[in-house]
Amino acid sequence: ANGDLDSYYGNLFFRIQSGRWAHNIILTCGWNDASLDRTAGIPGAGMYTMHGSTSGSSYGAFYEGTYDLYLNENNTSALQPLVNASVYRSRMDGFTESGGLGMNVDDMDSTFGTVGLGARLRGELSANLTGRASLGELRVQVVQLLGDRDTAAVLAPAGIPGAGFRVNGAREGATGVQVGAGITIPVGYTGSVFADVNADFRSRANSFNGSIGYRLTF
């Protein structure tokens, strides 16, 4: 089998700072396009090639609270104990594969949440001509997954909807360790370019991801 998944996300950031305490909220909305080509055979009947495609949406909310423990007199570097929580919902439309052994695929919705506890090390790296400093950070946290922990779908041979059955993917571990690093480089007076890399380690599922983008502060 061979497949492609294209995802498009938009994030809205909110941050409130009160003394050493900071509260961060991120609202996320996304759109997904997926396609799958697979080959299957029946003994004595040869091989068949099937194709399917679908789309869907996802949305979620994330909250994180931190407290600054400054590491120098200028308050330019800090160790931040942190706690966070999130909830996400995703939905993919049902579809019917084309091909000799095509299947109806449906019921792929999922809802899950996370709670995390960890720490972040942040510090200024350099300043640009506007006096704004580049920021770097390292972070580690333990995360507990709640809700749906595997991918599931209802399958039925095309044209025989009453013969459906549920298929469950691998069930990943509920507790994981996440590590990451990031850098933010100021651009002008209100903009900045950021880059992040992250890794998640848990039983039966390890993942790595990176992102780069532009953030406007106002």
For each predicted feature, which ranges?
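Membrane translocator/pore-forming domains, dominated by Gram-negative outer-membrane beta-barrels
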Residues: 1-218
